[in-house]
Curated annotation (Swiss-Prot):
Name assigned to this protein: 2,3-bisphosphoglycerate-dependent phosphoglycerate mutase
General function of this protein: Catalyzes the interconversion of 2-phosphoglycerate and 3-phosphoglycerate.
Pathway, per record: Carbohydrate degradation; glycolysis; pyruvate from D-glyceraldehyde 3-phosphate: step 3/5
Binding residues annotated for substrate, in chain numbering: 8-15, 21-22, 58, 112-115, 123, 139-140, 183-184
PANTHER family referenced in this protein's UniProt entry, alphabetically: PHOSPHOGLYCERATE MUTASE (PTHR11931)
Originating organism: Protochlamydia amoebophila (strain UWE25)
Amino acid sequence: MVKLILMRHGQSQWNLANLFTGWVDIPLSFKGIEEAIEAGKQIKNYPIDLIFTSSLIRAQMTAMLAMSVHTSGKVPVILHTGEGRLEEWASIYSSESQSQTIPVIRAWELNERMYGELQGINKEEMAKKYGAEQVHIWRRSFDVPPPNGESLQMTAARTIPYFENTIVPHLKEKKNIFIAAHGNSLRSIIMKLDGLTTDQVVKLELATGVPVIYDFNHDEYIKQQK
């Protein structure tokens, strides 16, 4: 059966510092690196044909580190489609080498929710300034965005169409897919896969560096139980 693996990136340096991150391109912390490798061990025996990540380095690092322990021994290779000379110069000219790679596609549509004017701000300081209730609304409501940022609803408006139009066709071709992305972009996708209501999705928690695995069969997504 075709597999769909979703994974929130490992702890980032700003997760560690308790700062709102959003689209700021922050790398993994040392703990995040360990989480990504440990998560890789949990999926090391699952077949993977294609990898999708966001355009942010913490998701890309997570995918690469997770694949470093995969039993296939195949090498994840970032594609540079549409990037002019880089696309041409990054070509692989050995069919044997090509067969031992797994394509990695980066997409901004899978980026974390954009937190606007909260980005780079300490979460506790923000609660003191605006009140814990207001910050909770910004973080956990479905349709209320932070100042100049995205709500979860707005995030879903880009992640779900990308998933349906770009990723699902590969699943239907029986390709096993691994997506390394972010808490909110993955929550919005899981909302679709599990048929969650808006009240349910805002309560959904995704731990860093923990895979969520689905079996895909004839347009049906069956979540594997832990």
